[in-house]
């Protein structure tokens, strides 16, 4: 039953046997289009997975979602930034359509913003095409918030209530089987899922438990003088979530160990200088603990799927030295569905200096389409020709492969 208390949303969950299922909703005499979902059996031989994030409504159309629907994946993994909280911007330049009012802070405003985004027909088609596994990032609440610390210190007094409203609206408007949040309490959304014995997913929450970003949350400053990043107790995930992650990986019997992650995990520093303190680079001891665990336990077939940064990149994860240390996993960073990227030529040159980075594409929007079998993981990076054109074509930029048992990425294109 859809009620006003839950913004007239429903979370319909039933016992489904493996196979393809089709569904629809009927309300008020109106019948929805038919949706498709696939439930994995105990030992599936393949998985087609679309990994996507960052769909700022104002800065582009959703041609990438149209392509996702056409590709008919088994599963869509959403890595965060389903909505953006910003107020309306004038149309022109990179803005192709506008938000419906000022920056959102209340439950009604967050609900209205979800309704606006979900009115897009290409996003609707992507939801109807496959089951979704959804996580949040920061813009579901506010840019670069950290636990109960807002981006702007002047907003601290009302931030807890704002976060409560945002978390509730997220639960109401996303396809999740989690219980609804309770105001003024932790809302645990980090969790696990599985695609039979082919892939074990661990979805991380890199916002609710983290220490505030160091050194003023600087971006592109390349300042190596930030001792704060190694202050005792700094964390990206919090103690309980770190234990949860390690326990799942240590106990996994699946072929592939997949981590749904928000910000870049690979080392993206240059001679010790941090490019972006919001990424795992701003929490080096937390990353070092995790990579040391992966190496010590010899966790096989680790694939980290990342969004947030609005660029496409492929990275090799190594313990210790990022150029020569032991390989502990692969990271596939998918670009944004529509959110503006970093296209400055100087930044492209900076990226080429990262020892852990194998390839990058900064200009285009899109997503990553992964094909998984027991033998290999293949990542196809799909890019939108023109995000300002609702009818834009979508093409393949590159394909990258990890052979099972290696944790090593090779460029296939």
Question: What does each of the following model-derived ranges do?
Answer:
Residues 1-413:
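Metal-dependent phosphoester/phosphodiester hydrolase catalytic core
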């Amino acid at each position: 039953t859809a009620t006003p208390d839950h913004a007239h949303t429903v979370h319909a969950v039933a016992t489904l046997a493996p196979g393809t299922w089709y569904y629809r909703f009927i309300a008020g005499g109106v019948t929805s289009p038919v949706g498709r979902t696939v439930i994995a059996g105990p030992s599936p031989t393949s998985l087609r997975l679309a990994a996507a994030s960052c769909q700022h409504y104002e800065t582009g159309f959703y041609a990438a979602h149209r392509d996702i629907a056409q590709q008919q994946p088994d599963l869509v993994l959403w890595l965060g930034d389903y909505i953006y909280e910003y107020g309306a911007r004038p149309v022109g330049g990179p803005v192709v359509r506008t938000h419906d009012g000022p920056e959102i802070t209340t439950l009604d405003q967050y609900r209205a913003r979800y309704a606006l985004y979900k009115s897009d027909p290409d996003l609707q088609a992507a939801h109807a095409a496959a089951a979704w596994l959804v996580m949040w990032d920061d813009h579901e609440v506010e840019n670069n918030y950290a636990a109960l610390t807002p981006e702007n210190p002047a907003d601290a007094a009302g931030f807890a209530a704002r976060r409560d409203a945002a978390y509730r609206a997220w639960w109401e408007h996303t396809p999740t089987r989690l219980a609804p949040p309770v105001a003024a309490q932790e809302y645990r959304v980090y969790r696990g899922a599985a695609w039979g014995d082919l892939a074990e997913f661990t979805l991380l929450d890199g916002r609710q438990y983290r220490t505030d970003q160091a050194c003023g949350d600087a971006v592109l400053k390349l300042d190596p003088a930030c001792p704060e990043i190694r202050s005792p107790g700094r964390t990206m995930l919090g103690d309980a979530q770190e234990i949860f992650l390690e326990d799942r990986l240590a106990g996994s019997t699946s072929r592939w160990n997949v981590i749904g992650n928000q910000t870049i995990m690979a080392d993206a520093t240059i001679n010790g200088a941090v490019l972006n303190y919001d990424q795992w680079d701003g929490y080096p001891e937390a990353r070092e603990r995790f990579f040391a665990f992966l190496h010590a336990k010899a966790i096989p077939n680790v694939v980290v799927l990342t969004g947030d940064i609005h660029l496409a990149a492929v990275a090799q994860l190594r313990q210790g030295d990022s150029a020569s240390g032991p390989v502990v996993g692969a990271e596939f960073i998918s670009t944004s569905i529509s959110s503006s990227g970093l296209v400055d030529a100087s930044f492209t040159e900076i990226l080429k200096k990262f020892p852990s980075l194998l390839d990058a594409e900064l200009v285009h929007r899109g997503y990553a389409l992964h094909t998984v079998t027991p033998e290999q993981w293949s990542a196809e990076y799909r890019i939108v020709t023109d995000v300002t054109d609702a009818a834009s074509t979508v093409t393949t930029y590159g394909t990258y492969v990890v052979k099972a048992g290696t944790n090593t990425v090779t460029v296939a294109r």
